[in-house]
Amino acid sequence: MNANLNKAYPNVSLENFFSTPLAATNDAVFAAIQAEYTRQNEQIELIASENIVSKAVMQAQGTCLTNKYAEGYPGRRYYGGCEHVDSVEQIAIERAKMLFQCQYANVQPHSGAQANGAVMLALLQPGDTIMGMSLDAGGHLTHGARPALSGKWFNAVQYGVDRQTLEINYDSVRALALEHKPKMIIAGGSAIPRTIDFAQFRSIVDEVGALLMVDMAHIAGLVATGAHPSPLPHAHVVTTTTHKTLRGPRGGMILTNSEEIHKKINSAVFPGLQGGPLMHVIAAKAVAFGEALGPEFRTYIDSVIDNAKVLAEVLQTRGCDIVTGGTDTHLMLVDLRPKGLKGNQVEQALERAGITCNKNGIPFDEEKPMITSGIRLGTPAGTSRGFGREEFKLIGEWIGDVLDGLVASPEGNPDVEQQVRKQVKALCQRFPLYQ
């Protein structure tokens, strides 16, 4: 156990309660935070679901709003003293509606998983049939995977991708829907590198009399700028996280153009699934939505996609197999089987070299989820940092060096990894965080 945990806690008296900084009262926590800052500052982040928020977003999240309970919705709270947090939440709602060109928004979900759960609570009954993309094809746990609540409470039917193209086969999805007659079909996922045809999904749900829920957590930033087609004209309800490509605080959100569905969603979020909203996080969401409404955000998203294409192209020249042959979005899947490597093995080697990513299953993967045959890479965080095409070309070459080093020495190649780590640190020093 860390020796710092056994140290006596300082006495924080009323006289210094509002003035004593974290470093003076909780040195173990402060040290861990500082170490994490150093890690983020000195390493390259390629986890596709992560990003780097602005200083303004962080400041909003660290305000006195953390003190305020506000069960209910603006103008309809169960507590007094909510006039100012009402303003904050209404700003977040109006900006979300403007950003995604929709009629209704609920900004209270604590996460994307909570948002998905609230939709299911609002629109489904236990035992109903749902259809979602399988995990190995690029779906998400909350879309009906067996370990998740959605896989336990509902009759979850999973669709996959075409074995040849590794993309969604809409004819196969239609055939499954006609066979199983689901109450809801879920589109979206956590590892889909190609554009999703939401109009095709709407055609299928209309044919079988189902509801269409789109989880756009990964592509929300792309949708906001028009870089990916919006699901709002087609979906009955849309969920998203507020981080990832949207570059806000960690949280969730639910959007719809249906007043009837909106009312059900509001009741499902509170009091159905959650209690008090996290008002400091909602403030940070409002700030992030405001940033995303600015013209520079479109430039950012265009760079995210361009950088992803560059990274994929470089990796292909280094002998890597990119699932579907490339990407239309911010992420890519690398099939490691041609190099005889495993996802967990490569994740660890890249981290030793100062590059963080995650092991990830690939379509029709025969490896266990904690091993996998692939890795997932994304460009949002690096692009937020200021990396452009030239930097991502370098990053692609460094990843290629680490992979080739592993092929030569499967237990790890310290010489290669240490050399890459030096280059990574030098690059990161040119693009510091929060300076």
UniProtKB/Swiss-Prot annotation:
<feature type="binding site">
    <location>
        <position position="260"/>
    </location>
    <ligand>
        <name>(6S)-5,6,7,8-tetrahydrofolate</name>
    </ligand>
</feature>
<dbReference type="Pfam" id="PF00464">
    <property type="entry name" value="SHMT"/>
</dbReference>
<dbReference type="GO" id="GO:0005829">
    <property type="term" value="C:cytosol"/>
</dbReference>
<dbReference type="GO" id="GO:0035999">
    <property type="term" value="P:tetrahydrofolate interconversion"/>
</dbReference>
<dbReference type="GO" id="GO:0004372">
    <property type="term" value="F:glycine hydroxymethyltransferase activity"/>
</dbReference>
<dbReference type="InterPro" id="IPR015421">
    <property type="entry name" value="PyrdxlP-dep_Trfase_major"/>
</dbReference>
<keyword id="KW-0663">Pyridoxal phosphate</keyword>
<comment type="subunit">
    <text>Homodimer.</text>
</comment>
<comment type="function">
    <text>Catalyzes the reversible interconversion of serine and glycine with tetrahydrofolate (THF) serving as the one-carbon carrier. This reaction serves as the major source of one-carbon groups required for the biosynthesis of purines, thymidylate, methionine, and other important biomolecules. Also exhibits THF-independent aldolase activity toward beta-hydroxyamino acids, producing glycine and aldehydes, via a retro-aldol mechanism.</text>
</comment>
<dbReference type="InterPro" id="IPR049943">
    <property type="entry name" value="Ser_HO-MeTrfase-like"/>
</dbReference>
<keyword id="KW-0808">Transferase</keyword>
<feature type="binding site">
    <location>
        <position position="135"/>
    </location>
    <ligand>
        <name>(6S)-5,6,7,8-tetrahydrofolate</name>
    </ligand>
</feature>
<dbReference type="GO" id="GO:0005737">
    <property type="term" value="C:cytoplasm"/>
</dbReference>
<dbReference type="InterPro" id="IPR019798">
    <property type="entry name" value="Ser_HO-MeTrfase_PLP_BS"/>
</dbReference>
<dbReference type="GO" id="GO:0019264">
    <property type="term" value="P:glycine biosynthetic process from serine"/>
</dbReference>
<dbReference type="InterPro" id="IPR015424">
    <property type="entry name" value="PyrdxlP-dep_Trfase"/>
</dbReference>
<comment type="pathway">
    <text>Amino-acid biosynthesis; glycine biosynthesis; glycine from L-serine: step 1/1.</text>
</comment>
<dbReference type="InterPro" id="IPR001085">
    <property type="entry name" value="Ser_HO-MeTrfase"/>
</dbReference>
<keyword id="KW-0028">Amino-acid biosynthesis</keyword>
<feature type="modified residue" description="N6-(pyridoxal phosphate)lysine">
    <location>
        <position position="244"/>
    </location>
</feature>
<feature type="site" description="Plays an important role in substrate specificity">
    <location>
        <position position="243"/>
    </location>
</feature>
<protein>
    <recommendedName>
        <fullName>Serine hydroxymethyltransferase 2</fullName>
        <ecNumber>2.1.2.1</ecNumber>
    </recommendedName>
</protein>
<keyword id="KW-0554">One-carbon metabolism</keyword>
<comment type="similarity">
    <text>Belongs to the SHMT family.</text>
</comment>
<dbReference type="GO" id="GO:0030170">
    <property type="term" value="F:pyridoxal phosphate binding"/>
</dbReference>
<comment type="pathway">
    <text>One-carbon metabolism; tetrahydrofolate interconversion.</text>
</comment>
<keyword id="KW-0963">Cytoplasm</keyword>
<feature type="binding site">
    <location>
        <begin position="139"/>
        <end position="141"/>
    </location>
    <ligand>
        <name>(6S)-5,6,7,8-tetrahydrofolate</name>
    </ligand>
</feature>
<dbReference type="InterPro" id="IPR015422">
    <property type="entry name" value="PyrdxlP-dep_Trfase_small"/>
</dbReference>
<dbReference type="GO" id="GO:0046653">
    <property type="term" value="P:tetrahydrofolate metabolic process"/>
</dbReference>
<dbReference type="InterPro" id="IPR039429">
    <property type="entry name" value="SHMT-like_dom"/>
</dbReference>
